[in-house]
Amino acid sequence: MKTPIELKILDSRIGSQFPLPAYATPGSAGMDLRAMIETTMVIQPGETQLIPTGIAVHVADPSLAAVILPRSGMGHKHGIVLGNLVGLIDSDYQGPLMVSCWNRSNEPFTLEIGDRLAQLVFVPVVQAEFKLVDEFDTSDRGEGGFGHSGTQ
């Protein structure tokens, strides 16, 4: 069963020149987001640019959130990653979706109008409530972290 999420088109090219975000296959977890820029853009090495996607979403359900994640080929082949690593879209946010793109390569990267640059994934959210304690119950792991379990 699919959960309905409100989507607002902010750029008229979405739905006419470029498709609405959609799952590419029945097993896809994410929907591609496109660079809805006005002209070709070059992202220089080390530079970060904020790219509009041409859409806004309103998740509305506090048990869900959306995350903007990189497309694997962009980082691996071109050195283009998200400037904030992961973009979190809270259920009550209604503004435009923007993608922060960082060129971590040594070469300029050309972004064309409508290029697919990231993906949108919806995830479940559990809102926790803290319970103050003086000590934790003992666990097998304890305070071990940052390499505590080894590499083998």
Swiss-Prot record:
Pfam families xref list: dUTPase
Alphabetical list of InterPro entries matching this protein: dUTPase, dUTPase-like, dUTPase-like_sf, dUTPase_trimeric
Gene Ontology biological process: dUMP biosynthetic process; dUTP catabolic process
Role description: This enzyme is involved in nucleotide metabolism: it produces dUMP, the immediate precursor of thymidine nucleotides and it decreases the intracellular concentration of dUTP so that uracil cannot be incorporated into DNA.
Chain sites annotated for binding substrate: 71-73, 84, 88-90, 98
Protein name, UniProt field: Deoxyuridine 5'-triphosphate nucleotidohydrolase
Obligatory cofactor(s): Mg(2+)
This enzyme's EC code(s): 3.6.1.23
Keyword terms of this UniProt record: Hydrolase, Magnesium, Metal-binding, Nucleotide metabolism
Keyword field contains RNA-binding: no
Pathway in which this enzyme or protein is active: Pyrimidine metabolism; dUMP biosynthesis; dUMP from dCTP (dUTP route): step 2/2
CDD domains from the UniProt entry: trimeric_dUTPase (cd07557)
Annotated transmembrane regions: none
GO MF: dUTP diphosphatase activity; magnesium ion binding
Catalyzed reactions per annotation: dUTP + H2O = dUMP + diphosphate + H(+)
Origin: domain of life: Bacteria
